[in-house]
């Protein structure tokens, strides 16, 4: 949802030297260009239970990454995170994105279990955004040692 949210505030980032979409799209809930609608709605319907376990396991490529995350998990309550998803979904449904060039390039993880990689690639292709694929899960950051590595990923 971060790629979508950052795009909504794009005017605040106009002076940024490099803007990278990482494992997301400007249309985050979309059958062709984001999380398929039915999948997202099922996730939302079962969010309280899902956010207790399986969801976060799906964010990572492997058990080792999940173990690292588990040492410093999200501190917000499940109710708060569910509310955030519900509010974001309402915003997504009520926002018409007429994409203007913003992202310099996109990083898409081959093994993203949250947003189908083929949908991300289709979205970035439609928006003429160069895409680099990497062999990671939805949260690729444990595989980089610095922001410079991410920037040089292109």
Each model region followed by its residue ranges:
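Gly/Ala-rich beta-loop-alpha elbow adjacent to hydrolase catalytic centers
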Residues: 1-6
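Flexible "cap/lid" loop of the alpha/beta hydrolase fold
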Residues: 12-46, 81-92, 144
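Short, conserved loop/helix-junction motifs that constitute active-site signature segments
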Residues: 13-14, 96-101, 125-126
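Hydrophobic/aromatic beta-strand patches that form the interior of the parallel beta-sheet core
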Residues: 18-22, 105-107, 132
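Conserved alpha/beta-hydrolase catalytic His-Asp/Glu region
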Residues: 48-89
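Short beta-strand/loop motif that positions the catalytic acidic residue
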Residues: 100, 105-108, 112
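Conserved alpha/beta-hydrolase "acid-adjacent" motif
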Residues: 113-119
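Catalytic histidine-centered segment of alpha/beta-hydrolase-like enzymes
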Residues: 114, 131-151
């Amino acid at each position: 949802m971060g790629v979508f949210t950052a795009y909504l505030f794009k005017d605040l980032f106009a002076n940024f030297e490099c803007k990278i979409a990482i494992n997301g799209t400007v249309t985050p809930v979309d059958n062709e260009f984001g999380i398929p609608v039915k999948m997202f709605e099922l996730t939302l319907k079962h969010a309280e239970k899902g956010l207790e376990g399986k969801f976060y396991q799906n964010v990572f490529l492997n058990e080792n990454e999940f173990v690292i995350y588990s040492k410093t998990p999200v501190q917000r309550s499940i109710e708060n995170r569910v509310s955030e998803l519900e509010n974001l979904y309402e915003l997504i449904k009520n926002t018409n994105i007429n994409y203007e060039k913003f992202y310099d390039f996109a990083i898409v993880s081959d093994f993203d279990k949250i947003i189908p990689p083929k949908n991300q690639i289709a979205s970035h292709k439609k928006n003429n955004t160069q895409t680099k694929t990497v062999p990671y899960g939805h949260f690729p950051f444990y595989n980089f040692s610095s922001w410079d590595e991410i920037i040089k990923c292109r």
